[in-house]
């Protein structure tokens, strides 16, 4: 099957396969689980929290680094598809706890791959990586999958090493693994530790709670490749269905957006003027890979994917999500 489509018969997916999703309670995990349920999958989820946040999922609370528990779950579920999203998902998380963060991202990947090596070597596994595996200073044009990998952050290193480990299991154990190098994405439900959600929350606080009409920002002189999370999870689904074994795929919009544009778009949501306070110690893009725009030609050609949601719609929905969240807390 090497070099052929990871799944070369749509009949297989008409049989409601068992789909295992690690990190299901995360920002992307929740969106992906809901999409897969709509597409008729039997979704099983793994995360560290006590309860699953997605209705309709068979849930297992566990530590992804616990190899024996991962193997037992895989033996029980017998998944045909595995989306591996579990791990520390932000550079700031690595800065605060580098040792444990690195262990989670690396050992969690090994636990999942090794379990599938012994339980179900025919399953298709998607390892979600990051654009931080690239060196943002390397390419004046868009990054393609052929660009060298040279991460400049500890988080990027963890994703780079995870991909190397995945390639080892492809070559030496014949596992059917595909890889993403996912660029920045945002949308409803994202943590305010990320720039778009941070600003949307601050503006919503002013509107809902009559907070002081002032927004705190850091440096906004950055151009960033943003995708809507709903486009991203659809790309993951299509890579699972049509991606090629051992291949990496950039998941990105292919367009750069200036942070200043995003800021002023969100400020326009307010019914009253908002002053801007620049904090020199605050980095607007601390969890955002800045200066890095991707090329998505390979993903488009091999899976038929294309981004459908413009950044303005993404920001509209993100802002409205925050308004609803704050209104619920208010009452």
What are these regions (language model features)?
Residues 137-142, 164-224, 229-238, 256, ...:
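NAD(P)-dependent short-chain dehydrogenase/reductase
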Residues 15-17, 311-331:
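Amphipathic terminal alpha-helices
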Residues 56-66:
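Rossmann-fold cofactor-recognition segment
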Residues 64-104:
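NAD(P)H-binding glycine-rich loop region in Rossmannoid oxidoreductase-like domains
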Residues 19-38:
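N-terminal Rossmann NAD(P)H-binding glycine-rich loop of SDR-like oxidoreductase domains
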Residues 96-99, 103-111, 124, 132-179:
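Catalytic helix-loop patch of NAD(P)-dependent Rossmann-fold dehydrogenases
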Residues 214-215, 219, 247-249, 258-264, ...:
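C-terminal "lid/loop" region of Rossmann-like NAD(P)-dependent oxidoreductases
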Residues 232, 236, 251, 262, ...:
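Non-catalytic, hydrophobic alpha-helical segments
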């Amino acid at each position: 099957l090497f070099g052929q489509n990871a799944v070369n018969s749509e009949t297989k997916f008409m049989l409601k396969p068992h789909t295992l999703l690690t990190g299901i309670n995360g920002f992307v995990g929740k969106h992906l689980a809901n999409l897969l349920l709509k597409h008729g999958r039997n979704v099983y989820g793994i995360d560290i929290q006590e309860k699953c946040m997605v209705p309709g999922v068979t849930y297992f609370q566990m530590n992804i680094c616990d190899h024996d528990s991962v193997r037992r779950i895989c033996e029980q579920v017998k998944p045909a598809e595995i989306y591996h999203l579990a791990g520390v998902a932000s550079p700031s998380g690595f800065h605060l706890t580098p040792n444990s963060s690195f262990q989670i991202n690396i050992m969690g990947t090994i636990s999942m791959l090794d379990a599938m090596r012994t339980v179900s070597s025919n399953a298709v596994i998607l390892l979600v990586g990051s654009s931080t595996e690239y060196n943002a200073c390397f390419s004046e044009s868009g990054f393609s999958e052929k660009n060298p990998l040279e991460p400049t952050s500890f988080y990027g290193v963890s994703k780079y090493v995870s991909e190397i480990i995945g390639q080892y299991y492809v070559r030496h154990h014949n596992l059917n693994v595909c890889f993403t190098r996912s660029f920045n994405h945002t949308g409803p439900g994202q943590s305010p530790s990320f720039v778009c959600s941070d600003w949307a929350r601050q503006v919503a606080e002013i509107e809902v709670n009559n907070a002081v009409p002032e927004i705190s920002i850091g440096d906004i002189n950055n151009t960033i490749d943003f995708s809507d999370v709903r486009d991203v999870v659809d790309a993951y689904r299509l890579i699972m269905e049509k991606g090629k074994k051992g291949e990496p795929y950039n998941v990105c919009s292919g367009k750069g957006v200036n942070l200043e544009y995003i800021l002023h778009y969100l400020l326009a949501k307010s019914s009253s003027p908002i002053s801007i306070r620049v904090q020199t110690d605050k980095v607007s893009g601390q969890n955002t890979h800045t200066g890095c725009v991707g090329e998505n030609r390979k993903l488009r050609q091999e899976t038929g994917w294309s981004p459908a949601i413009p950044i303005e719609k993404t920001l509209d929905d993100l802002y409205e999500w925050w308004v609803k969240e704050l209104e619920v807390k208010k009452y």
